[in-house]
A protein has these predicted regions:
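Structural and coupling elements of P-loop NTPases
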Residues: 1-245
Length: 245
């Protein structure tokens, strides 16, 4: 969403691909353009999913043309313009290569994801992870989520946090490593490069900091964040009529 541009950019930089969900009747929405522009800019090759194909007012042919025009207007590359299309109804629980079905589960979408997206690109070296989001948990404390760029991480491992300028923010030990399994987070013994994980144990590190092995001195370059949609400045009224209006 345009109101959360920074968060959108950080999330997109964790993924290897994207599924662009478009309503079969309404077509691309304003927020579709915003998020798609970000995805194309960093080189992602989206899968286009035409959803709600069961609506009586669906117009999938026109919507596909609108999506193609949107890609072209956003300066998509030839490879990005050659996007695969899948149709279906999330409400009814099916996806298929054809708008007419077969209406037999979500497997075609999952198969397309495996086929179309490249595996995670990993780097050699000790553990490094760029913090993408933070949250507070009543049991775990500060929870940092990000993608492991290189190396591996285990619970009770010593790490440090580097700010974007390379200064050490804090040093500590990881108390818990959580991996994502569907919509749930489950504790794991170890996470490796390419995994998206959540960790706890640090108290000061924040978004755009690099969590890394103690031997690392260079932080991961953080994605520039869009300026606010609206900015406001407040100052004390020190005019001659202050307090007299």
């Amino acid at each position: 969403h345009a109101d959360f541009g920074g968060e959108v950019e950080r999330i997109l930089n964790m993924v290897d691909g994207a599924v662009l969900l478009v309503d079969a009747a309404e077509g691309p929405m304003p927020q579709t353009k915003f998020v798609l522009q970000k995805a194309l800019k960093i080189g992602l090759r989206p899968i286009v999913c035409i959803n709600k194909i069961d609506r009586p007012d669906e117009r999938h042919n026109e919507v596909v043309n609108e999506v193609f025009d949107l890609f072209a207007n956003l300066d998509a590359s030839e490879e990005q313009l050659d996007f695969p299309i899948i149709y279906g109804s999330a409400k009814q629980g099916w996806m298929a290569d054809s708008p007419t079905g077969p209406q037999d589960g979500m497997a075609p979408l999952f198969d397309l994801v495996v086929k179309h997206f490249n595996p995670p690109v990993v780097e050699d070296g000790p553990f490094r992870m760029l913090v993408t989001t933070i949250e507070s948990n009543p049991f775990l404390g500060r929870v940092l989520t990000g993608r492991v760029r290189s190396g591996a991480i285990k619970a009770n491992q010593s790490v440090k946090a580097l700010a974007r300028d390379g200064k050490t923010v804090e040093q500590g030990r990881i108390s818990k490593v959580l991996a994502f399994r569907g919509l749930e987070r489950v504790p794991v013994d170890e996470a490796e490069a390419g995994d998206i994980i959540a960790i706890s144990g640090l108290t000061t590190a924040t978004v755009a900091d690099t969590i890394c092995d103690s031997s690392v001195s260079e932080p991961i370059a953080a994605q520039p964040i869009d300026p606010p949609t609206l900015t406001m400045t407040f100052r004390i009224n020190d005019g001659p009529l202050a307090g007299k209006e």
